[in-house]
């Protein structure tokens, strides 16, 4: 079976790529952040490839207070399949996702999204990827890992540091750090958390892709 795994950023996929390097039938696409980038990247791939399954993967912000850092959560919108039972067996939890147009950076914003949508987690690409797959009749499953919980603020407003295409402007990031050097410790801690989250995601993906 051939599987396409979609990640917005290389950092989200780094541990999994070590496991999946050069494995036949396993494809990885880095879409960039946001719906438009995701749709464009997936359409481009599917123009010349026909995978049996598409997984939309990466980080998600927690909206449900019960979700912890490193929890792997999933949503199966297609008819039930073997993948769903594999995800349960791998320790992943079913969840409802909200696909946002901006990064939820504060506790207050996450609380508001939770109240308005009833979602357990927030991310920025999966709705677009599911829509493209639905057009082609390709099963698609969202598999994400909680990288920041409902009870924590992010150290910076990353929306203000984005380019018009929603990808991070590293020049703006450097300037933001230079203006607020006190944020460096929190940013280092965030990097540790996201690295841990990526490892947890890779462990689950390993079980469902290669079992």
What are these regions (language model features)?
Residues 3, 7, 14-211:
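Glycine-rich phosphate- or other oxyanion-binding loops that anchor nucleotides, phosphorylated ligands
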